[in-house]
């Protein structure tokens, strides 16, 4: 099977993934994607929260309504924490990523997202699917996490730790870019008393953070309810939403209002991967090819069958809690299991 390189769209949101402005961005990307529209929402940025499934679930509920004309299949991907049952290295949990043509990550902690995604199976799958045309939408904490350097918002704003600029997931390094992203750029939640601009840390601390960045670095600031859609294939960035985005380099900041566009190389010198497989482990592509082959043949993937068999054993032992847990895991991977008088019946959602 031949792998074809077709970069998807990347949308970075300053905030408001479930707002009117966010909905328009999602629809803009959905219009460009083939059917069926398969959306995977990664829980990782909020994986430390006890209600991380609800955080991602709110986005899922919004998209199921906002994109209802596209009849989306929406899966939550509970890749919450390394070394647990919900690890971002667990191929069973990550199954929806193999066929998703829209991947979404949202609120949480940027530094947590980086710690639990960097050099994982989950993140490599996201990068690979993007090179096959999948759209990527990042908002809030995820917008920060995918850049070259991270603003450790909670650590500075809530805990009072010293200002640092730790490495991020480096999504744009695949294109030769040294780019960091700061959402909530024009935030005013603090009113007249506290400067909460620049993602809540305020202008003074933001300037200190800037001084820690390497040379030839670009910072992308995104106002509230504003987004930037990056199209590497056409070489164009489009600003959408209610306000503007700002580009900070050595010269004076560039401000681009909503409704305008600019060349993608304004983000920095671009070098697109010459080969779709460049920089991504060969095993990732094998997983994707296997998933495509199974979809074409209509067969039940082996990992799904294993979960179904395990559930059968749990039911025979009267372990109903385990049975329900396995059912949920099967559903999270895009399959349904029904109990009949003749046994379990498995079908794709």
Feature map (PLM): residue ranges:
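C-terminal and late-domain segments of enzyme folds
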Residues: 1-37, 41, 45-62, 66, ...
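General beta-strand structural signal in soluble alpha/beta enzymes
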Residues: 12, 75-76, 104-105, 136-139, ...
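Portal/gating segments that form or line small-molecule/metal binding sites
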Residues: 46-105, 112
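Catalytic-core regions built around general acid/base machinery
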Residues: 95-96, 119-133
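Catalytic nucleophile loop
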Residues: 104-107, 130-151
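Glycine/threonine-rich flexible loop motifs
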Residues: 110-120, 191-195
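Structural preference for alpha-helix termini/caps and helix-kink/transition segments
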Residues: 283-349
